[in-house]
């Protein structure tokens, strides 16, 4: 899966550590483009040892890959919202600098991959800290902001978001897939959520553009 194949918001159910490492290497090793990975995690899941075996950090050709990886621990939606604002600032400043032709602008196109794992943990922690209503507001605002940022791409900078969820949290998706009953109509995407939907199913129905398997 390459950057160009990603939708604005993509769900990736239970990727293996090997597939995740291959994805990172494939996208961050390209020439003539700066691809940065922002790995936002609530569960300390970045497969560092596997990645170092696949991409030895001591080799000169791999230095650039490691320089373009940012790993952040994020425990609630307030922290995720703050990170989203920082990414928006990065994209905006790069766009402004490119228009002005300043030395601060990235000379090669900037592509940002925002990889979020543990969103259900962040959501649950936010519910404990504030309220269910506030948590839903933060989730909605963050996801909508990511969509706006993705749509506002240009030749100098763009962003794509990947959300990792356990497969077992997407039982409704797999049931509908097996029965060939899912509809993509706008009306069905906007229908009221059934009681018992997991966070992953909620995001799949209302915010995600695709699900990668």
Swiss-Prot record:
Q: Which residues cross the membrane?
A: none
Annotated family: Belongs to the CSM2 family.
Which locations, inside or outside the cell, does it occupy?
Cytoplasm; Nucleus
Residues annotated as signal peptide: none
Function of this protein?
Involved in chromosome segregation during meiosis. Promotes efficient recombinational repair and functions in the protection of the genome from spontaneous and induced DNA damage like mutations and gross chromosomal rearrangements (GCRs).
Tell me the InterPro entries matching this sequence.
Answer: Csm2, P-loop_NTPase
**Name used for this protein in its record:** Chromosome segregation in meiosis protein 2
Does this UniProt record's set of keywords contain Nucleus?
Answer: yes
């Amino acid at each position: 899966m390459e950057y160009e194949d990603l939708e604005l918001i993509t769900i990736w159910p239970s990727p293996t550590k090997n597939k995740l490492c291959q994805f990172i290497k494939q996208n961050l090793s390209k020439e003539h483009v700066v691809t940065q990975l922002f790995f936002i995690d609530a569960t300390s899941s970045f497969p560092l040892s596997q990645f170092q075996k696949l991409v030895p950090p001591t080799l000169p050709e791999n230095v650039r890959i490691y320089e373009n990886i940012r790993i952040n621990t994020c425990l609630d939606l307030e922290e995720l919202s703050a990170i989203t604002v920082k990414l928006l600032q990065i994209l905006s400043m790069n766009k402004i600098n490119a228009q002005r032709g300043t030395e601060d602008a990235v000379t090669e196109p900037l592509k940002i991959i925002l990889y979020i794992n543990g969103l259900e943990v962040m959501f649950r922690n936010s519910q404990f800290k504030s309220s269910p209503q506030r948590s839903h507001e933060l989730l909605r605002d963050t996801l909508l902001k990511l969509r706006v940022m993705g749509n506002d791409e240009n030749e100098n900078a763009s962003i794509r978001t990947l959300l990792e969820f356990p497969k077992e949290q997407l039982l409704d998706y797999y049931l509908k897939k097996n029965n060939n009953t899912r509809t993509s109509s706008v009306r069905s995407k906007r229908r009221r959520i059934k009681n018992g939907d997991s966070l992953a199913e909620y995001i799949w129905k209302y915010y995600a553009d695709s699900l990668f398997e």
